[in-house]
Amino acid sequence: GFNVIDNYTYCFLGDGCLMEGISHEVCSLAGTWKLNKLIVIYDDNGISIDGKVINWFSDNTRERFESYGWNVIGPVDGHDIDEMDRAIATAKQSQDKPTLIIARTVIGKGSPNRQGTSKVHGEALGEEELKLTREALGWKWDPFVIPQEIYDAMNAREKGEKLEAEYNEMWARYGQEYPQLCKELSRRLKGDLPEDFEAVMQQAIEKAAVAQETVATRKASQKALNAFASHLPELLGGSADLTGSNLTNWTGVEAMRPDTYLGRHINYGVREFGMSAIQNGIALYHGFVPFSATFLTFSDYSRNAIRMAALMKQRSIFVFTHDSIGLGEDGPTHQSVEHIPSLRLIPNLNVWRPCDTVEALVAWQSAIESRHTPSIIIGSRQNIEFIARDPQEVVRDAKEALKAGAYVMKESGKGADGVDCVLIATGSEVPLAVKAREALEEKGIGTRVVSMPCTELFDKLSSEEKRAILTDAPKVAIEASVTGLWYKYVKNGEVVGIDKFGESAPAGVLWEKFGFTVDRVVEAAMKAINH
């Protein structure tokens, strides 16, 4: 056979890492999945920044990992290269378990006055201690000088070149014997999309533009998945125990299980942070387009992983549903108000809040095509009315949304040159903006409605392009979230939003209570106009 992908994955961690909650989430899951090619080396030095960890970390690490279903080796001497080499060789023999190698070490080993203390953890040794350390280690060479014998012993270039040549020769033979498989694997490892992907998405958008269905945008997201997932074999999704609510599964998809890794949907269990971090690892490995899902309010648990995806410029896709007070009786613990604007503050992250199936398709297309920018796709629990208009107009709007993150959904009754007011909305508030426009038009106020599903793409436009969409007319932004960020778009205009936590009540009652009504939007528009 051709072992074109046969690597082990190595992870190095310390005492502090094992104190973090995420270590339980992911290590428990790795044991359940029987990931035998995962080898974790634990630097067990007993020291963290505050001192000896025995005062705040007294777990029996061996028993902990054995309870997860891991193979545990050690403790071994982490300073003994031969002993470590034997431990790794033993770990590679595991057939059905990941392996933890407990490597006992002395932090700062060789420093006469600081080894084994927290001082060497977060501080430089200093010139005097460096001098003493060199003497203790018998190191006679100047700083930054590597003796030739050590350089030669550590230089793996010749060995690496030989192994790479052997691998390239095997890859060439693989390509000759299995040309289609080789071509497909090469495409996926490069991160390129299938040649027909754009056409598939365009066809799905055109179909949705005709159907004009009124659905919850979590359902719209699932419809998008059903449209393209079979054409994107590298798509690998999952949910943190909310598959039936997030709607991350698609027709015909199989779940990944410990007895088969062929499934393309992962049941992560209630592990939001672990799920999001695993997804980043999958993205870094290449060959897959990973996405994960939970409720929007639980994005707080995933925030560090989201930030890291943005920092590392990875194509990670995060689906967050149940996005506002619109979810109703679950109350303020589950009703997001601050999450959307706070996620928009993360650099190099596209946050999509679509209002219908067409915008959901656009959001997915953008997320999948954004190779170096992670994306968030936000969905509602409740149905959102599709704003009826000519299908060709809808398709045109979709192209504009994909490029600009915003578009004119409804023009002023006085035409583009007669805009007296602009209503900007996202997601479930777009139909409210359209209804408010009708009321304003009856008052003789030419009102344009702009749907802005992705503010980040809009922010990248030139001043002229932004003005073409928003004009210089007074503006009102409408979104069921904290209002602050919207003032950069409305300037001295108005924002209809929520600057306090929600309450437990039916969604209809909450919309009325928090001022998401036509009368409130009209009032805000009149105030903006009369500033």
Where are these regions (language model features)?
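Small/polar loops that bind or transfer phosphate-bearing groups
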Residues: 14, 76, 239, 293-294, ...
